[in-house]
Amino acid sequence: MARIASVNIPDNKRLVVSLTYIYGLGPAMAAEICNKAKISKDKKVKELTDQELIGLRNIIESEYKVEGDLRREVTLNIKKKKDIRCYQGLRHIRKLPVRGQNTHSNARTRKGKAIAIAGKKKAVK
């Protein structure tokens, strides 16, 4: 397995698909990286030479934020919004959907497991 940006990418898949295993690289960005490195997108990772792998590593590390750096930046952005108490920050603090989704009947994933509410007390006759 080749190792790029501290991620083991699978050998038996096409290069474009393998690059998407790296956090922060989607199909479009993977294709763009292949074009910059002048490597065929259909080439499998196990067919790459050492020089091509080094070229890919250099392009990814110098021009793109991926893996740890990107995760850290996203976390800091969320923390900043929480600190300034903007609307999105408050939604993060309350563990509710941030981008305007409905919460009346949905958002179970974001809100967590449903909490049972005690039923009405039976009247004594």
Swiss-Prot record:
Point out the signal peptide segment.
none
One Gene Ontology term, aspect cellular component: small ribosomal subunit
SS bond partners: none
Instruction: Recall the GO molecular function terms of this protein's record.
Output: rRNA binding; structural constituent of ribosome; tRNA binding
Q: Which Pfam families match?
A: Ribosomal_S13 (PF00416)
- Could you confirm whether the keyword Nuclease appears in this record? no
Q: Which keywords, in A-to-Z order, does the entry hold? A: Ribonucleoprotein, Ribosomal protein, RNA-binding, rRNA-binding, tRNA-binding
Give GO terms for biological process: translation
In terms of Gene3D superfamilies, this protein maps to: 1.10.8.50, 30s ribosomal protein s13, domain 2
Instruction: Give the family this protein belongs to, as stated in its UniProt record.
Output: Belongs to the universal ribosomal protein uS13 family.
Which HAMAP family does UniProt cross-reference here? Answer: Ribosomal_uS13
Q: Please give the PANTHER family that the UniProt record associates with this protein.
A: 30S RIBOSOMAL PROTEIN S13/40S RIBOSOMAL PROTEIN S18, SMALL RIBOSOMAL SUBUNIT PROTEIN US13M
Partners and quaternary state? Answer: Part of the 30S ribosomal subunit. Forms a loose heterodimer with protein S19. Forms two bridges to the 50S subunit in the 70S ribosome.
Please describe what this protein does. Answer: Located at the top of the head of the 30S subunit, it contacts several helices of the 16S rRNA. In the 70S ribosome it contacts the 23S rRNA (bridge B1a) and protein L5 of the 50S subunit (bridge B1b), connecting the 2 subunits; these bridges are implicated in subunit movement. Contacts the tRNAs in the A and P-sites.
- Protein name (Swiss-Prot/TrEMBL): Small ribosomal subunit protein uS13
Annotated organism of origin: Rickettsia conorii (strain ATCC VR-613 / Malish 7)
